[in-house]
Amino acid sequence: MWSRNVRLLGSWTRSYMVPATKRKTIPVYPPVQRIASSQIMKQVALSEIESLDPGAVKRKLISKKNKDRLKAGDVVRIVYDSSKCSYDTFVGYILSIDRKQLVQDASLLLRNQIAKTAVEIRVPLFSPLIERIDLLTPHVSSRQRNKHYYIRGTRLDVGDLEAGLRRKK
C-alpha cells in the first residue's frame, strides 16, 4: 500500500509550472552617445541673475572681494517692496550669510528680539520682494567668525535691536 502511494507522488507535476520550449533572448542595445555638455544651468543662472539684480548691488553686498561687504555681526534693515507684499521692515543681526553655488540662491540669517521672544528669519537675498538692504551697524571686530550661531541663548545674544537704535538717535 505504501509503495503504491510513493509511485503516484513521483509522477505528479505541478500545475503552475510551464515547461520551457525555447530560450528567451534579451536584446542588448549599444550605449547612447553622450552629447557635449554646454553648461545650460550656468547660462540660465546668468540670465536670471541679470534680471534679479541689474545693477549688481546685491552681488557686491556678499562678494568676498568687496571690502564693504556684509559680514556676520552686522545689523541690517530689510525693506520690502510695499506694492508687491505686505511684509514689514525687519531689523536683524546677521548670524550667517549663506553663499550657494548659484549666486541667486544666497540668503541671510537674521536674529532679533521682538516682544521678549527671539526671532530668526532667513531672507533670500535676491528675492524680488526686497526693495533694499540698509547696513545700520557694522560688525564688532572682536567677533571675527563666519557664523555667529554661538550667541544664541548667551549674554552675547541680541536684545531688541529696534529699541536700541531708537535710543541711540
UniProtKB/Swiss-Prot annotation:
GO cellular component terms attached to this protein's record: mitochondrial inner membrane; mitochondrial large ribosomal subunit; mitochondrion
Keyword flag Mitochondrion: yes
Major localisation: mitochondrion
Gene designation per UniProt: IMG1
Localisation per UniProt entry: Mitochondrion
Entry-linked Pfam families: Ribosomal_L19
Keywords: Mitochondrion, Ribonucleoprotein, Ribosomal protein, Transit peptide
Note: Present with 4150 molecules/cell in log phase SD medium.
Record-given protein name: Large ribosomal subunit protein bL19m
GO MF, one annotated term: structural constituent of ribosome
Function: Component of the mitochondrial ribosome (mitoribosome), a dedicated translation machinery responsible for the synthesis of mitochondrial genome-encoded proteins, including at least some of the essential transmembrane subunits of the mitochondrial respiratory chain. The mitoribosomes are attached to the mitochondrial inner membrane and translation products are cotranslationally integrated into the membrane. bL19m is essential for respiration.
Disulphide bonds in the chain: none
Span of chain positions assigned to the transit peptide in the UniProt entry: 1-16
Organism: Saccharomyces cerevisiae (strain ATCC 204508 / S288c) (Baker's yeast)
Family per similarity comment: Belongs to the bacterial ribosomal protein bL19 family.
Oligomer and partners: Component of the mitochondrial large ribosomal subunit (mt-LSU). Mature yeast 74S mitochondrial ribosomes consist of a small (37S) and a large (54S) subunit. The 37S small subunit contains a 15S ribosomal RNA (15S mt-rRNA) and 34 different proteins. The 54S large subunit contains a 21S rRNA (21S mt-rRNA) and 46 different proteins.
One BP annotation, GO: mitochondrial translation
